Amino acid sequence: MSDINQIEFSEISKKDELKSIIESLLFVSGEPLALKDICRIVEEDFKYVEDLMRELMNIYNGDSSRGIKIISLNGTYQLVTKTKNSEYVQKLLKKNVRQSLSQASLESLAIICYKQPITRVEIDEIRGVKSESAIQRLVEKNLVEETGRLEVPGRPILYGTTDEFLRHFALNDLGDLPSIELFEENDEVSDMVEE
């Protein structure tokens, strides 16, 4: 084997080994891992590991026969099950297949995701009814969180969506939300969010 072929083989072996290590890290973590933490653990530079992550994502996300995929969210990576298999995963975990949100919670969530940061009073005004229990349910489900306080008397809480919201709805960021114009057929929802 020539020196050039030996170097290429060595580089391929190194990449395969690092991809294997990264897969293991993502698997055992169960939580999103920051790219900088992966770099620190495998002792490689940011750009190199970022390229490896892209390759791994292409492998997992491009193969329809696999039941898992890698998602990227705000500079973190996580190994998750594919949405199409959620029904079966839920059966294994013996949870309700659908832990549905009430209409009030869905309305509140729609308003928060399009108008954030927003106060409870502003949500109440848009909906025309009290939203406190709906917002509390969204907070309990980790879809919404306190993002700060409005600098006015009483300093009301500002609400916004969480990374869990993005993961739950398979969004990379809020820019992936459907345009509000898509909801124009449902004037009630459109009017609530546009107010």
Curated annotation (Swiss-Prot):
Annotated transmembrane regions: none
Keywords assigned by UniProt, alphabetized: Cell cycle, Cell division, Chromosome partition, Cytoplasm
Subcellular location: Cytoplasm
Any one of the GO CC terms: cytoplasm
Primary localization: cytoplasm
GO biological process, one term: chromosome separation
Gene3D superfamilies recorded: Winged helix-like DNA-binding domain superfamily/Winged helix DNA-binding domain
Family: Belongs to the ScpB family.
Subunit-structure text: Homodimer. Homodimerization may be required to stabilize the binding of ScpA to the Smc head domains. Component of a cohesin-like complex composed of ScpA, ScpB and the Smc homodimer, in which ScpA and ScpB bind to the head domain of Smc. The presence of the three proteins is required for the association of the complex with DNA.
Role noted for this protein: Participates in chromosomal partition during cell division. May act via the formation of a condensin-like complex containing Smc and ScpA that pull DNA away from mid-cell into both cell halves.
NCBIfam families, alphabetized: SMC-Scp complex subunit ScpB
Protein name per UniProt: Segregation and condensation protein B
Species of origin: Clostridium perfringens (strain 13 / Type A)
Name of the gene encoding the protein in the UniProt record: scpB
